[in-house]
Amino acid sequence: MLSRRALMMAGGSLALGAGSARATAIMTEDGFYREDWFLDSFLELAEDRKSVAAAGKQLAVIWEQPGCPYCRETHLVNFAQKVAETYIRDHFEVLQLNLRGSRIVTDFDGERLGENQLAHKYGVRGTPIIQFFSDKDDLAQKAPLEREVSRIPGYMPPRAFLLMFAFVAERAYERGSLRDYLRRQG
């Protein structure tokens, strides 16, 4: 759990830029920033979710596209903060997908789609978007948007970004709304 004290210290560190000197984001041949700790996957979401859950973590999917300035900001500012990186790595596996990509992904329900078709199926239209999926085994039976427990719908400043990950990691969505959670965090 991200304690109030840890959160305040993290917020101060983020505001001062502490930890921003480390950089694990690399620019790939296809124009993406990628963290060296992102999930390497065969793009089979049900299998990824199972292995992630077995490790005691949750699956997050980040949708990006080449040239996206807010995707760049997410990597070079948010993921670059040591406190955020550590928290996310401890609680999540992050799979990076291309909004306009053509790699074949097997969805939770077994449907095989190109990345761009999968994005459309989940209502992903812009970038960056981070989807957080339930760690329950019943995802194949649910409608696509009901599989998510939360979503970051675009760029968020570092403190709010970290709080979204904490909201999901603590399963606070089971006890109330994000708004209530944020109010309690101060």
State where each predicted segment sits.
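N-proximal helix/coil linker or "cap" segments that precede and/or mark the start of modular domains
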Residues: T24-W37
